[in-house]
Amino acid sequence: MSAKTILQIKNLDISFRTNAGVVHAIRGINLDLQKGETVAIVGESGSGKSVTMKAAVGLLDSNATINSGEILYTYDDGHGQDKTVDLLKLSKKQLRTEYNGQRLAMVFQDPMTSLDPTMTIGKQIMEGMLLHKHMPKDEARTKALQLLELVGITDAEKRFRNYPHQLSGGMRQRVVIAIALSAEPDILICDEPTTALDVTIQSKILDLIKQIQQKMHLSVIYITHDLGVVAKVADYVNVMYAGKIVEVGNVEEIFYEPCHPYTWGLLSAMPDLETADDRLYSIPGSPPNLLHEPVGDAFAARNRFAMVIDKKAEPPLFTVSA
């Protein structure tokens, strides 16, 4: 039996109006997520990773325009039947009240800015359950305490009454994960969830998300520039460059048999503890200015293997996995 596709992004195209002109930030994205799968979207800052997933949860800035595309979400309607909805066609109110948090939840990179400093931890976890699940307060409180224990926070009763500033960075990120899980979503989107944490805590948070994924049968999307995170958690990898996905494959094939020169460059820039080289490889040049639509391969100017045709024609998507 084939895996069920729970999220499908088709030909997504997004631009932003700026004082300098129109920035064509997302240029025809296609991406699939299967039930229970972990997919990573990896690329440099500004490649369009976060914008792609913010479109799915209705968090694009007001100057954004969705020019084309679909984001199809498939879920059980409660009667044993699959229902598919295009998230881009929903009103902001419908997306906020029926889907965000309840079916799709997002964990952001900086837990301090994700939490309300004026509200206790407990109230912030309960908020989603009261809004989406319409739970009685006593039941929501009990569930919030259970979630704190699930994400590895000891002395849950005490922490329930704490404010964000009273917790360490690692504990705050655990709270953010608890909030994301409070309405029992199908899909968890993690946007650089460990960037603001030290290396030891990073590993613990990644292990925690994996454990919760298996326990709650979640599908997870990681947005990251950290290939170490990708190697640890991902089943499949989508490599993004200049608003496009340029290579797709499972994690082993991407790491050991990369096809696109940009993917090769990213991997070459990773530190290797087995070599004595003091100098890290860096990809020459800078990403293109998307105020001006790139002609041909957007990576050609930075690619030492580029041919004449690369500056004239856009290459096809590199798919490593069959």
Regions found by a protein language model. Give the residues of each.
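The feature captures the beta-strand-to-loop junction immediately N-terminal to the Walker
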Residues: 42-44
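ABC ATPase NBD Q-loop/coupling interface
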Residues: 17, 70-98, 136, 254
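A short, proline-enriched helix->beta-strand linker immediately N-terminal to the Walker B motif
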Residues: 182-186
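Conserved ABC ATPase "signature" region
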Residues: 72, 139-158, 210, 267
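P-loop NTP-binding/switch modules centered on Walker-like glycine-rich loops
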Residues: 58, 189, 193, 197-279
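Short catalytic/signature loops enriched in Gly
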Residues: 5, 80-84, 154-157, 250-322
